[in-house]
Amino acid sequence: MGKLFGTDGVRGVANKELTCELAFDLGRAGAYVLTEMHKKPKILIGKDTRISCDMLEAALCAGLTSVGADVYLAGVVTTPAIAYLVKSHGFDAGIMISASHNPYEFNGIKFFNSQGFKLSDQIEEKIEDIILNKKWDEVPHAQFDAIGRVNRVDLKKDYQEYLKSTLNGASFKGLKIVIDCANGAAYKIAPEVFEELGAEVVVINNQPDGTNINKECGSTHLKMLQQEVVKNRADFGIAYDGDADRTLFVDEEGNIVDGDKIMLLLAQNLKQQGRLSRNTLIVTVMSNMGLFVAAKELGIELEVTKVGDRYVLEKMLEGGYSIGGEQSGHIILLDFATTGDGILTSLQLTKLIRESGKKLSDLAKIMKVYPQVLVNAKVENGKKDLYSKDPVILEAIKKVEEKLNGKGRVLIRPSGTEPLIRVMIEGEDYEEIKKDAEALASLIESRLS
């Protein structure tokens, strides 16, 4: 992982860290690196609903076309839609402008290769090298008759039809579902798909205004969805984040069903159908201890990776596994998609719920959740790795681990996308671990500020 590209593309505060100039440079360098593989690359661009997306899109277009690439603008679509459409429509690369679940002032630029996978580290490093070391002499401007063109395309329907095709004719008639679109990229795509499948849909947070994406809504703020599910007497609720690469559910009683439970239910279903590749589910270190206990009882093997869907995907591709994901609702179903797809995941789980004939609250009993507390310590990006060398912080962590005595764990993890260090503690006594997590986060902030 380099200086520009984080775990999920290039990300930062729009017009401050992620500027037009940087977007233009990413377009130029990206198109040049891709022209080494394709004479005149065709590049598909999508965006979420942030106010800064139009600005960054224009800068990217200028950079890409100046090197001779042809650009196709898909408008507001989800990140997984770009990944799917790049491959299905024969584009040479895709770019998504989004900062996913982050607040609206952030934005990001994420590249996909022609197969719909995120760019390899090697290609990201080539792009980075040109920009950071100002190797613009290597990047020629296109001859005036070879400048790229910008085209607008509407491919949403193709993606929606593909999503429905993964369900083998299932109908959601008779189901009442509340969908929280996070005022983000799924605000039209998701409700339309569920309605076309026969569900009665109550939609919330589907009025994006450029500044309300993820604001007190979506998969990172589930309170409104919980209330609406109970109020509307719905069968369950579904929440997406800003670019719909993740999803979480709420059962009919208003309880949260997180990514751990969702992927365990889907893995168990695949196992019953004989489709769980190598009988294994890929999870991250953030998954709850309850998942490990339940998987063992169900006879499902687990492989554990670092946090970040790119690490989950790497492990899946390496071992030929079919399902993996994160507690946050980032779930990859490799039989159908090359990246985490919130709408796809929610359709598959809805099909499972419908076919089981059970309530989601009953299905969610598949695992017992151990109390888990996550507290964020605000630390500048450049100082995030220093915690592991600070003797005072290390001693404090050791003391908490001794107190847990094998019946819990402490996980300290710098965020790959934000200026934060995440402190996660799991144990049997919620109040106790909450106190310890807050104390550790506070110590980290004071030591590294």
Curated annotation (Swiss-Prot):
Q: From the UniProt record, which GO molecular function terms apply?
A: magnesium ion binding; phosphoglucosamine mutase activity; phosphomannomutase activity
Kindly give the InterPro entries that the UniProt entry links to this protein. Answer: A-D-PHexomutase_a/b/a-I, A-D-PHexomutase_a/b/a-I/II/III, A-D-PHexomutase_a/b/a-II, A-D-PHexomutase_a/b/a-III, A-D-PHexomutase_C, A-D-PHexomutase_C_sf, A-D-PHexomutase_CS, Alpha-D-phosphohexomutase_SF
The protein's UniProt keywords, in alphabetical order, are: Isomerase, Magnesium, Metal-binding, Phosphoprotein
CDD domains reported for this sequence: GlmM (cd05802)
What does UniProt say on post-translational modification here?
Answer: Activated by phosphorylation.
Provide the family line: Belongs to the phosphohexose mutase family.
**What is the designated name of this protein?**
Phosphoglucosamine mutase
Question: Organism, per UniProt?
Answer: Caldicellulosiruptor bescii (strain ATCC BAA-1888 / DSM 6725 / KCTC 15123 / Z-1320)
Gene symbol here is glmM
